[in-house]
Amino acid sequence: WIMGHMVNEIYQIDEFVDLGANSIETDITFDDDAMAEYSYHGVPCGCMRWCHKWEYVNDFLEGLRRATTPGDSKYRKQLILVVFDLKTGDLSSSTAYKGGKLFAEKLLRYYWNGGSNGGRAYIIISIPDIDHYAFISGFRDALKKSGHEDLLAKVGYDFSGNDDLNSIRSALHKAGVKDREHVWQSDGITNCLLRSLDRVNEAVKNRDSSNGYISKMYYWTIEKYATVRDALNAEVDGIMTNYPDVIVNVLNEDSFKNRFRMATFDDNPWELFKR
């Protein structure tokens, strides 16, 4: 999965897919009532990027729905996965549940079209703070109570704060998520800085073990050719990047073209892949 980083305006969906992304990451900010408000990152946001692109969440979700609904004039077949990077910093442990409930209701209305012919992309809820695990509980409960529990088949989970893996596993369990139940594990840092692959290797080892909790592992945010090669050699499932074309180029190199391929809609992002 080539994951386009910080896609916060609707026009950027086409921009990143045209560069080779089959997945995008979108930042979501919340108002004082725990309601998702904008697709917006703000500063700091990484090197060589403009941090202030934004849409109202409702508008972005409708644009995203069109881009992932077969038959729509804006449909992009390649776009199969969306990571919502949830900026929950202004939420408390007590309001996180409400935030998750309200966000699920928003997705149901504006992205899934009330459960009728909505967008088809898989969704990952990515939360930076393991103390906000109740966001996941609220999200799941809202879909169940609305009679759309079936949509949880399209939803995965990630804690992105580079916490201890056992602590993440515990937070997932508190949220009601079982081991390997659509769990993506991220590791990374802003593209301005270097980061070792130590925790990536630990997560990959967990993913590949008989008693791990991780379904897929992705690394963010990289674009240097050497770093991309190192990440692929570490056997990650996804790479988040500002330059999807760089990842495409590396995948076409002799060392990788027979080892990796781009994921398609037929590839289940929740299934453990073993060579």
Curated annotation (Swiss-Prot):
Q: Where are the transmembrane segments?
A: none
| InterPro entries per the UniProt record, alphabetical | PLC-like_Pdiesterase_TIM-brl
Q: Which CDD domains match?
A: GDPD_like_SMaseD_PLD
Give compartment(s). Secreted
Which segments of the protein form a coiled coil according to its record?
A: none
Q: What does this protein do?
A: Dermonecrotic toxins cleave the phosphodiester linkage between the phosphate and headgroup of certain phospholipids (sphingolipid and lysolipid substrates), forming an alcohol (often choline) and a cyclic phosphate. This toxin acts on sphingomyelin (SM). It may also act on ceramide phosphoethanolamine (CPE), lysophosphatidylcholine (LPC) and lysophosphatidylethanolamine (LPE), but not on lysophosphatidylserine (LPS), and lysophosphatidylglycerol (LPG). It acts by transphosphatidylation, releasing exclusively cyclic phosphate products as second products.
Q: Which family does it belong to?
A: Belongs to the arthropod phospholipase D family. Class II subfamily.
Stated name of the protein: Dermonecrotic toxin LamSicTox-alphaIV1iii
